[in-house]
Regions:
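Short beta-strand element of the alpha/beta-hydrolase
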Residues: 81-90
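C-terminal catalytic histidine-bearing segment of alpha/beta-hydrolase fold enzymes
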Residues: 243-246, 250-303
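Short amphipathic alpha-helix adjacent to the substrate-entry channel of hydrolases
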Residues: 99-117
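Primarily recognizes the serine-hydrolase "nucleophile elbow" in alpha/beta-hydrolase
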Residues: 137-221
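N-terminal cap/lid segment of alpha/beta-hydrolase-fold proteins
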Residues: 22-79
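Short beta-strand/loop motif that positions the catalytic acidic residue
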Residues: 222, 228-230, 234
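Catalytic nucleophile-loop/oxyanion-hole region of alpha/beta-hydrolase
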Residues: 96-98, 122-154, 273-278
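Conserved alpha/beta-hydrolase "acid-adjacent" motif
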Residues: 236-241
Length: 303
């Protein structure tokens, strides 16, 4: 049964992943993970028939990720502008929405001339930062590997950001807040893990129990420019997550842009619908020009 589940996952990935060319795949940790794996069994797709179709297309999810990795999707060399983004799919830290919040995002980034680095971080895990640091360690390592390979992958090391969806949006915010975190089982590194920008899409876990930003995510002026999107009728990760985080960014004098929409729900990725929220990628592209990640170089903070 396990071998059949893995074969089914591979077939679904082949059918559902867009034509964007994957150039490299690297393990995040060439040897063992910093902590012993708690995952039992091979990678599988836990999607059921009831939630397999989103906006008329198949959705592929992955769980039991014990060997975290990154996959690099490079744009057409004629369009490559040197900018890049790490992509963290969501899935409640239980699974990863690998195509709707992963490979399809890479296809969009490549259309903008950007390199996409899709991060397959460890799931499921027992909680998330700060109770569990494995997700942050994977995110840090992915950013450091990307900067270390910047020349080889034709990337400007000072124009590398993060894009996260749902739980992945929380992970993006954690990385931006704690790029210098030192895991006790992780060798020290001089390579900076701080992103140059972050895009936080329908985030969860940013709001604390007191109605303010989570204490573990209290922004400082070192947080990079931030773009946020959420729907008011998001009943999975409520809109208060974006509201309190935006206010905390404003208080810390971090450049931030917030887009709230009446309808949209949760987990829509970039798939088009007849709702205004489907226009968020165009808003994000304009914002990337505003902060000079795209277009002429500008005053983006350098690590």
């Amino acid at each position: 049964m396990r071998s059949f589940s893995y074969l089914l996952l591979c077939c679904l990935l082949a059918l559902a992943i867009p034509s964007t060319a994957q150039n490299y795949t690297l393990p995040l940790w060439p040897g063992d993970n910093p902590e012993p794996s708690k995952v039992v069994g091979p990678e599988i797709d836990p999607t059921t028939d009831a939630n397999r179709i989103v906006s008329g297309k198949v959705t592929v999810r992955v769980t039991n990720v014990s060997k975290p990795s990154l996959a690099v999707y490079s744009p057409d060399p004629a369009k490559n502008n040197g900018a890049a983004a790490l992509v963290f799919p969501g899935g409640s830290y239980i699974r990863l929405a690998y195509n709707i919040e992963g490979t399809e995002v890479c296809e969009w980034l490549n259309s903008l001339g950007m390199t996409c680095v899709l991060v397959k971080y460890r799931v499921p895990e027992e909680g998330h930062y700060p109770e569990n640091v494995e997700d942050l360690e994977d995110a840090q390592q992915a950013m450091r590997l990307t900067r270390a390979h910047a020349s080889e992958w034709h990337i400007d090391p000072y124009r590398i950001g993060v894009i996260g969806f749902s739980a992945g949006a929380h992970l993006a915010a954690v990385l931006s807040t704690h790029p210098d975190f030192q895991g006790k089982n992780v060798p020290a590194s001089s390579m900076d893990a701080r992103p140059n920008f972050q895009m936080i899409i329908y985030p969860g876990w940013l709001s604390g129990s007191d109605g303010k930003v989570s204490p573990s995510l209290q922004p400082t002026a070192q947080i990079p420019p931030t773009f946020l999107v959420q729907a008011e009728n998001d009943y999975t990760a409520h809109v208060e997550n974006s509201l309190v985080y935006f206010q905390a960014l404003k208080d810390a004098k971090v450049p931030a842009e917030l887009h709230l929409f009446t309808q949209g729900g949760h987990g829509f990725g970039l798939r088009p619908t007849d709702l205004p929220i489907s226009r968020w990628p165009a808003l994000a592209e304009a914002w990337l020009h505003t902060i000079h990640i795209l277009g002429a170089p500008g005053p983006i903070g350098r690590p």
